[in-house]
Amino acid sequence: SSPSLTAQVGGMYLPSVGGVADPNALYVVWGGGNDVRTGDPAVLTNSVPNIVNIISALAAAGATNFLVPNLPNIGLTPEAQAGGPAVVAGATFLSVTFNGQLIAATAGLRSSLGVNIIDLDVYAFLNTTIANAGALGITNTTGRCYSGTTGIGGPGTVCANPNEYVFWDGIHPTAAAHALLGNYASSAIPVPAAAWLFVSGIAALGALRRKAA
Protein backbone atom coordinates (compact mmCIF):
# COMPACT_ATOMS: atom_id res chain seq x y z
CA SER A 1 0.00 0.00 0.00
CA SER A 2 1.03 3.61 -0.46
CA PRO A 3 2.63 5.37 2.52
CA SER A 4 0.46 7.67 4.60
CA LEU A 5 0.89 11.43 4.36
CA THR A 6 2.56 11.39 7.76
CA ALA A 7 5.07 8.84 6.50
CA GLN A 8 5.58 10.75 3.26
CA VAL A 9 6.52 13.90 5.15
CA GLY A 10 8.30 12.61 8.23
CA GLY A 11 9.83 9.48 6.78
CA MET A 12 10.51 10.46 3.19
CA TYR A 13 10.40 14.16 2.30
CA LEU A 14 12.03 15.83 5.29
CA PRO A 15 14.88 13.29 5.51
CA SER A 16 15.51 13.78 1.80
CA VAL A 17 16.08 17.53 2.31
CA GLY A 18 18.09 17.23 5.49
CA GLY A 19 15.15 18.31 7.60
CA VAL A 20 15.09 21.78 6.04
CA ALA A 21 11.99 22.78 4.06
CA ASP A 22 12.20 25.38 1.30
CA PRO A 23 10.72 28.64 2.67
CA ASN A 24 9.94 29.80 -0.89
CA ALA A 25 8.04 26.66 -1.89
CA LEU A 26 4.29 26.23 -1.91
CA TYR A 27 3.47 23.02 -0.06
CA VAL A 28 0.27 21.27 -1.10
CA VAL A 29 -1.07 19.12 1.73
CA TRP A 30 -4.13 17.12 0.71
CA GLY A 31 -5.54 14.14 2.53
CA GLY A 32 -8.61 12.62 4.10
CA GLY A 33 -10.22 11.00 1.08
CA ASN A 34 -9.52 7.42 2.02
CA ASP A 35 -10.69 8.04 5.56
CA VAL A 36 -14.05 9.24 4.28
CA ARG A 37 -14.25 6.30 1.90
CA THR A 38 -14.24 3.89 4.83
CA GLY A 39 -17.69 5.15 5.77
CA ASP A 40 -16.69 5.03 9.43
CA PRO A 41 -17.04 8.31 11.37
CA ALA A 42 -14.56 7.04 13.97
CA VAL A 43 -11.82 6.99 11.34
CA LEU A 44 -12.10 10.77 11.02
CA THR A 45 -10.99 11.23 14.61
CA ASN A 46 -7.35 11.53 13.60
CA SER A 47 -7.72 12.78 10.01
CA VAL A 48 -7.56 16.53 10.54
CA PRO A 49 -5.22 16.34 13.57
CA ASN A 50 -2.77 14.40 11.39
CA ILE A 51 -2.92 17.11 8.73
CA VAL A 52 -2.33 19.71 11.44
CA ASN A 53 0.72 17.76 12.59
CA ILE A 54 2.03 17.51 9.02
CA ILE A 55 1.72 21.26 8.43
CA SER A 56 3.27 21.95 11.83
CA ALA A 57 6.22 19.67 11.06
CA LEU A 58 6.81 21.34 7.71
CA ALA A 59 6.53 24.79 9.29
CA ALA A 60 9.01 23.80 12.00
CA ALA A 61 11.38 22.78 9.20
CA GLY A 62 11.05 26.19 7.56
CA ALA A 63 8.02 25.99 5.25
CA THR A 64 5.91 29.14 5.20
CA ASN A 65 3.45 28.74 2.30
CA PHE A 66 0.73 26.10 2.10
CA LEU A 67 -2.18 25.20 -0.15
CA VAL A 68 -4.65 22.98 1.70
CA PRO A 69 -7.50 21.59 -0.41
CA ASN A 70 -10.59 20.24 1.27
CA LEU A 71 -12.38 17.14 0.02
CA PRO A 72 -14.84 16.97 -2.84
CA ASN A 73 -18.18 15.38 -2.06
CA ILE A 74 -17.09 11.74 -1.99
CA GLY A 75 -20.77 10.87 -2.27
CA LEU A 76 -20.66 11.99 -5.91
CA THR A 77 -18.01 9.45 -6.92
CA PRO A 78 -19.04 6.41 -8.98
CA GLU A 79 -17.78 4.19 -6.16
CA ALA A 80 -20.16 5.75 -3.64
CA GLN A 81 -23.03 5.94 -6.11
CA ALA A 82 -22.71 2.21 -6.77
CA GLY A 83 -23.21 1.58 -3.06
CA GLY A 84 -26.70 3.03 -3.02
CA PRO A 85 -28.42 5.94 -1.26
CA ALA A 86 -27.20 5.09 2.24
CA VAL A 87 -23.56 4.98 1.15
CA VAL A 88 -23.96 8.22 -0.79
CA ALA A 89 -25.54 9.98 2.18
CA GLY A 90 -22.85 8.71 4.53
CA ALA A 91 -20.02 9.75 2.23
CA THR A 92 -21.51 13.20 1.77
CA PHE A 93 -21.98 13.63 5.51
CA LEU A 94 -18.41 12.59 6.26
CA SER A 95 -17.05 14.85 3.51
CA VAL A 96 -18.87 17.85 4.98
CA THR A 97 -17.81 16.91 8.52
CA PHE A 98 -14.16 16.59 7.52
CA ASN A 99 -14.21 19.89 5.63
CA GLY A 100 -15.72 21.72 8.58
CA GLN A 101 -13.00 20.42 10.86
CA LEU A 102 -10.30 21.25 8.33
CA ILE A 103 -11.28 24.89 7.80
CA ALA A 104 -11.30 25.45 11.56
CA ALA A 105 -7.89 23.81 11.86
CA THR A 106 -6.24 25.87 9.14
CA ALA A 107 -7.58 29.06 10.70
CA GLY A 108 -5.96 28.06 13.97
CA LEU A 109 -2.66 27.24 12.26
CA ARG A 110 -2.48 30.65 10.61
CA SER A 111 -2.65 32.21 14.03
CA SER A 112 -0.43 29.80 15.95
CA LEU A 113 2.27 29.24 13.31
CA GLY A 114 2.21 32.57 11.49
CA VAL A 115 2.28 30.85 8.09
CA ASN A 116 0.43 31.51 4.84
CA ILE A 117 -2.33 28.96 4.23
CA ILE A 118 -4.62 29.04 1.21
CA ASP A 119 -7.80 27.01 1.65
CA LEU A 120 -8.86 25.44 -1.66
CA ASP A 121 -12.56 24.59 -1.82
CA VAL A 122 -12.57 21.42 -3.91
CA TYR A 123 -16.04 20.56 -2.59
CA ALA A 124 -17.44 23.65 -4.29
CA PHE A 125 -15.26 23.07 -7.36
CA LEU A 126 -16.71 19.62 -8.04
CA ASN A 127 -20.27 20.81 -7.48
CA THR A 128 -19.74 23.73 -9.87
CA THR A 129 -18.04 21.53 -12.46
CA ILE A 130 -20.95 19.09 -12.48
CA ALA A 131 -23.52 21.89 -12.60
CA ASN A 132 -21.76 23.46 -15.60
CA ALA A 133 -20.66 20.25 -17.28
CA GLY A 134 -22.13 21.05 -20.69
CA ALA A 135 -20.31 24.35 -20.97
CA LEU A 136 -17.07 22.60 -20.05
CA GLY A 137 -17.42 19.91 -22.69
CA ILE A 138 -18.29 17.20 -20.17
CA THR A 139 -21.07 14.77 -21.02
CA ASN A 140 -20.76 12.24 -18.19
CA THR A 141 -20.63 13.36 -14.56
CA THR A 142 -21.62 10.14 -12.82
CA GLY A 143 -20.01 7.22 -14.63
CA ARG A 144 -16.46 5.95 -14.80
CA CYS A 145 -14.44 5.96 -17.99
CA TYR A 146 -12.20 3.08 -16.95
CA SER A 147 -14.08 -0.08 -16.05
CA GLY A 148 -11.26 -2.09 -14.49
CA THR A 149 -9.96 -2.40 -10.96
CA THR A 150 -8.86 0.85 -9.35
CA GLY A 151 -5.07 1.02 -9.35
CA ILE A 152 -2.17 0.98 -11.75
CA GLY A 153 -1.83 -1.72 -14.37
CA GLY A 154 -5.08 -3.53 -13.68
CA PRO A 155 -7.01 -5.07 -16.57
CA GLY A 156 -10.02 -3.18 -17.84
CA THR A 157 -11.52 -1.17 -20.65
CA VAL A 158 -11.35 2.55 -21.34
CA CYS A 159 -14.18 4.65 -22.73
CA ALA A 160 -13.85 6.24 -26.16
CA ASN A 161 -14.16 9.81 -24.89
CA PRO A 162 -12.33 10.18 -21.54
CA ASN A 163 -12.10 13.97 -21.84
CA GLU A 164 -15.89 14.11 -21.58
CA TYR A 165 -15.92 12.36 -18.20
CA VAL A 166 -15.39 13.77 -14.73
CA PHE A 167 -14.30 10.44 -13.27
CA TRP A 168 -11.62 8.13 -14.62
CA ASP A 169 -12.45 5.24 -12.30
CA GLY A 170 -14.50 4.86 -9.15
CA ILE A 171 -12.80 7.68 -7.29
CA HIS A 172 -10.20 9.49 -9.41
CA PRO A 173 -10.75 12.34 -11.87
CA THR A 174 -9.87 12.19 -15.54
CA ALA A 175 -7.05 14.22 -17.06
CA ALA A 176 -9.67 16.74 -18.21
CA ALA A 177 -11.01 17.14 -14.67
CA HIS A 178 -7.46 17.35 -13.35
CA ALA A 179 -6.76 20.21 -15.75
CA LEU A 180 -9.86 22.09 -14.60
CA LEU A 181 -8.85 21.62 -10.98
CA GLY A 182 -5.32 22.77 -11.75
CA ASN A 183 -6.64 25.98 -13.25
CA TYR A 184 -8.90 26.47 -10.25
CA ALA A 185 -6.01 25.97 -7.84
CA SER A 186 -3.79 28.34 -9.81
CA SER A 187 -6.45 31.04 -9.65
CA ALA A 188 -6.55 30.72 -5.86
CA ILE A 189 -2.87 31.60 -5.48
CA PRO A 190 -2.55 35.35 -4.93
CA VAL A 191 -0.39 37.61 -7.07
CA PRO A 192 2.57 37.89 -7.10
CA ALA A 193 2.77 34.14 -7.57
CA ALA A 194 6.38 34.59 -8.69
CA ALA A 195 7.34 34.61 -5.03
CA TRP A 196 6.35 30.94 -4.88
CA LEU A 197 8.28 29.49 -7.77
CA PHE A 198 8.45 25.89 -6.61
CA VAL A 199 5.45 23.76 -5.73
CA SER A 200 6.13 20.82 -3.46
CA GLY A 201 3.13 18.50 -3.69
CA ILE A 202 2.99 16.46 -0.51
CA ALA A 203 -0.23 15.02 -1.92
CA ALA A 204 -1.91 15.82 -5.19
CA LEU A 205 -5.10 14.35 -6.66
CA GLY A 206 -3.75 10.94 -5.86
CA ALA A 207 -4.58 11.72 -2.24
CA LEU A 208 -7.89 10.00 -2.74
CA ARG A 209 -6.13 6.72 -3.36
CA ARG A 210 -3.65 7.14 -0.54
CA LYS A 211 -4.15 6.85 3.16
CA ALA A 212 -5.08 10.27 4.32
CA ALA A 213 -2.70 10.99 7.12
Residue ranges and their predicted role:
Residues 191-208:
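A short, hydrophobic C-terminal helix/tail in secreted or cell-surface proteins
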Residues 1-49:
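Conserved SGNH/GDSL esterase-like catalytic core that processes O-acyl groups on lipids
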Residues 5-9, 47-54, 94, 98-105, ...:
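Stable alpha-helical elements in mature extracytoplasmic
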Residues 73-97, 104, 108, 114-171:
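Mobile gating loops/cap/lid regions near enzyme active sites that modulate substrate access
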Residues 32-46, 71-87:
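Active-site His/acidic residue clusters
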Residues 170-188:
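A recurrent domain-boundary module in secreted/ectodomain proteins
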Residues 25-31, 35-37, 59, 65-70, ...:
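Structural recognition of the beta-strand scaffold that forms the well-ordered cores
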Residues 210-213:
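Short, charged juxtamembrane terminal tails flanking transmembrane helices
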